[in-house]
Structures are given as C-alpha cells and as structure tokens.
Swiss-Prot record:
Location within or outside the cell: Plastid, Chloroplast thylakoid membrane
One Pfam family it belongs to: PSII_Ycf12
Function field: A core subunit of photosystem II (PSII), probably helps stabilize the reaction center.
Origin: domain of life: Eukaryota
Subunit annotation: PSII is composed of 1 copy each of membrane proteins PsbA, PsbB, PsbC, PsbD, PsbE, PsbF, PsbH, PsbI, PsbJ, PsbK, PsbL, PsbM, PsbT, PsbX, PsbY, PsbZ, Psb30/Ycf12, peripheral proteins of the oxygen-evolving complex and a large number of cofactors. It forms dimeric complexes.
Transmembrane segments: 5-25
Main location: plastid
Entry membrane topology: Single-pass membrane protein
Protein's name in the database: Photosystem II reaction center protein Psb30
C-alpha cells in the first residue's frame, strides 16, 4: 500500500473518532447537560 493512503486513512479515522470522544469528554467534565 502507498504510505500517503495509509496516512489519509489514519487521519480520517482519527477525525471520525475525535467527534464522539470530544462529546464524551465534555459531558463527563460538565456533568449533566
């Protein structure tokens, strides 16, 4: 596989995982929303 493709896939996965992760962290830090 091409290294650029692997890098783009990794970035995409990190971005998709960062969305729900930020929501969970904010809700956990702020308590009940």
């Amino acid at each position: 596989m091409n290294l650029e493709i692997v890098f783009q896939l990794t970035s995409l996965v990190l971005i998709l995982a960062a969305g729900p992760l930020v929501v969970v962290l904010l809700s956990a830090r702020g308590g009940n929303l």
